[in-house]
Design a protein with these regions (language model features):
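Small cysteine-rich, disulfide-bonded extracellular modules of the LU/uPAR three-finger superfamily
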Residues: 1-86, 93-135
Length: 135
């Protein structure tokens, strides 16, 4: 499950505004019926309409960055209800959706779409060489 990087996310890494190790990084589960990605224009979580946000994870743990490849422990979305999940996006959580920078987007995982049923949803990152994403 290799993700595409948002242009502004890439800019954030290069400008030193995103610190993979120190920053709070979360994952938003997305209903694409309410969001059309603009990989180079979308910048902040606020660019993903609230109606498209099916669930948000806790902060990523056990983050790694060897050789420019981002990795982390698998994610659990808890007690998810609502629309089908057709995509996910990683973002730097500042506590304010207007400044929480989007990092990566994935709508091509073999695990998608997911139909929530009120239970937990496990998101397992790719164990291969590209893990979550590669800079």
């Amino acid at each position: 499950m290799t993700a595409r990087l948002y242009g502004k996310g890439r800019e954030g890494f290069l400008g030193g505004d995103i610190d993979w190790d120190a920053d709070i990084i979360k994952v938003v589960a997305i209903d694409t019926a309410n969001y059309s990605v603009s990989i180079d224009a979308d910048e902040f979580l606020a660019d993903i309409p609230a109606a498209a946000r099916v669930s948000i994870s806790d902060a990523l743990t056990s983050k790694t960055k060897a050789l420019g490849v981002a990795g982390a422990a698998n994610v659990v979305f808890q007690e998810v209800t609502g629309a089908d999940i057709e995509a996910i996006a990683l973002y730097q959580d500042t506590g304010n959706e207007a400044t929480s920078r989007l990092i990566a987007y994935n709508d091509e995982s073999a695990d998608l779409p997911i139909l929530p049923n009120g239970g937990d949803i496990n998101l397992n990152w790719d164990a291969g060489v590209n893990k979550i994403f590669k800079l």
